[in-house]
Amino acid sequence: MTVSTPGIRPVVSALALAVAAGLGDARAASPETAFTVTIESVTTPTTLKLPDGSGAPAPLSPGVAYVGKEASPFFAVGKPASKGLQMQAEAGMPDGIAAEVKGAVKFGRNEPVTVTARPGDRFTFAVMFGQSNDLFYAPKGGSMALFDKAGRPILGDRTAEVALYDAGTEVNQIPGVGPDQGPRQKTWRQGELEHGTVWPVRDAWAYPPLAEVIRVTVSAAPSS
């Protein structure tokens, strides 16, 4: 798979991955359920409102996904970002984080998604908010449940469970304008270092509503 920094056009991303894990005899005895997870860019050419009154798209990058029991193996709020997360958040390059986390799977643009899981499993992902220095989308709290307490699959639009995070590795510039952001930077490490920690984004800039940038849908996978 070829991984590149985000473009500046609307992108529809869907991931096709098969994740099977054996995490103990009880879990292994539970039947597996196959899901289709779609991570879709719904940006338009004017999603971002720029200081000069014009607009710009807010594309998503390639990303990385994981199914497991924990909140997220990719990041923890209040902790410094790993090198891999830094690469993902600053340049949309998932290679590093995929190498750091056993079982993590990279995904690119326009790829179909199939996730196989058992009750108790959770799904997480990270994709760069392309018009930023080091922001990324991921589930709130790190991951989202795939089953309810009764073991039934949770299907439908899950976008409301997603948040925009700041990796804390590079000082934020005005989204869609900053010279050290995805579409305009020459290298992924050219921005001013921040030496911070991962938090839900909280700065002086305005960002588009979640539903104008990304849509995450979980559905039953078609029978093979």
For the regions a protein language model found, what residue spans apply to each?
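Bacterial N-terminal signal peptides that target proteins for export
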Residues: 2-13
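Bacterial N-terminal signal peptides
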Residues: 13-22
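Sec/Tat signal peptide C-region and signal peptidase I cleavage site
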Residues: 23-28
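Structured domain cores in non-transmembrane regions
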Residues: 30-34, 42-147
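Extracellular low-complexity, O-glycosylation-prone Ser/Thr/Pro/Gly-rich "stalks"
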Residues: 53-65, 74-78, 84-90, 146-224
